[in-house]
Design a protein with these regions (language model features):
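Acidic/histidine-rich catalytic cores and adjacent linkers
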Residues: 201-326
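RNase H-like nuclease fold core
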Residues: 1-21, 26, 30, 50-149, ...
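N-terminal alpha-helical segment
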Residues: 27-28, 192, 208-211
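Short alpha-helical segment immediately N-terminal to, or the first helix within
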Residues: 33-37
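DNA-recognition alpha helix
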Residues: 43-51
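Conserved beta-strand -> loop -> alpha-helix junction used to position metal-binding or nucleic-acid-contacting
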Residues: 117-119, 145-155, 159-196
Length: 326
């Protein structure tokens, strides 16, 4: 509003109520960020001793309200206009009876977008199906055959193929190497590492199959349990090689590494939670906030300029270009 200065001139005056509201909004945001960063209520009261919003009950109410907004923001984002070629799925363990499956979409221009998550008692088929059903309803549609990177769960693979029957499913090499290593004597770790290093650097179907065959023979001579672990995955560990995709994309697409990095950031923010209440939206609030924060730090995929070559490999021989990025 404007206030007369006694003459012809007047000056702009900020209402005290406006300043108070603006200050309150800043304090709310600061409290929210401090909460998810692990700052205790006591320390927050030291930062804002005059604010009534730093009482334990006020902080709790604020988190319930603002956290619910984050869930809405997370699941309300428009994704139908994006040009997705891939989907990465992995589970994050919260407690003995609470797990979340997280989906990250990969676009034709190399961006990574946290799409959604589903919380359940375990990484079971219903949880995975609910997640993918919601993505379909929201408009998730790959530009060609879907390329999916999975942590190794048969449940995840089954759900992906139920929704996208012609999807290419790549098994995470890091997870599989770790499981095979657990079956071997330590003296064989070095050789195992070398085989997987060769896979991570390999280009094309012929080289991929050759290394897979050598790895299989190596494990057959060392430990039958390790061999069984490899055969459980089968050629899913060389799915990217089998479609002759550019090796420049190996770092990004042969493991669930960048989703695991997201989980580390989320766990860091959720570390102060001592008890998860499955009867509330507590887990959803923390996941929505943590994943959105993690997404802020995402960079383009390594080798992203070669993604169009991959998409071309993913198209069926008789399939015309369905959607073209501008």
């Amino acid at each position: 509003m404007r206030r007369s200065t006694g003459g012809r001139d007047s000056e702009e005056v900020r209402l005290e109520s406006y300043n108070a509201a603006k200050h309150a909004g800043a304090v709310r945001e600061a409290i929210l960020r401090a909460l998810v960063a692990g700052v205790s209520g006591r320390d927050q009261r030291r930062l804002y001793p005059e604010s009534p919003m730093t009482s334990k009950s006020s902080v709790s109410r604020l988190w319930v309200k603002e956290g619910a907004k984050k869930i809405g923001e997370f699941r309300g984002r428009e994704i139908s206009g994006e040009f997705f070629f891939g989907l990465m799925l992995d589970g994050i363990w919260l407690s003995e009876d609470l797990t979340a499956v997280v989906a990250i979409g990969m676009t034709s221009d190399g961006r990574k977008i946290v799409l959604d998550f589903q919380v359940g008692s375990s990484e079971n088929r219903d949880v995975c199906d609910d997640l993918l059903d919601r993505l379909v309803r929201r408009g998730f549609k790959p530009v060609a055959r879907l390329f999916s990177v999975l942590d190794g769960s048969d449940t995840l693979k089954g759900s992906v193929l139920a929704h996208y029957p012609d999807a290419v499913t790549q098994r995470c090499l890091i997870h599989k190497e770790k499981k095979i290593r657990g079956c071997l004597s330590k003296r064989h770790y070095g050789e195992l590492f070398d085989y997987f290093k060769r896979l991570r650097n390999a280009q094309g179907a012929e080289t991929g199959r050759e290394i897979y065959k050598e790895l299989r023979e190596f494990l057959a001579s060392k430990n039958l349990k390790a061999l069984a672990s490899l055969e459980e995955a089968g050629e899913d560990i060389i799915a990217l090689h089998l479609i002759d995709a550019p090796a420049t994309l190996n770092v990004s697409l042969l493991s669930t590494n960048f989703i695991e990095n997201s989980f580390r950031n989320v766990r860091a923010k959720m570390g102060r939670v001592k008890r998860w209440r499955s009867e509330t939206d507590q887990a959803e609030r923390w996941l929505a906030y943590g994943l959105l924060e993690a997404e802020r730090g995402f960079r383009r995929m390594k080798g992203w300029k070669d993604i169009p070559k991959l998409v071309k490999k993913l198209k069926k021989p008789d399939e015309p270009a369905q959607r073209k990025a501008a």
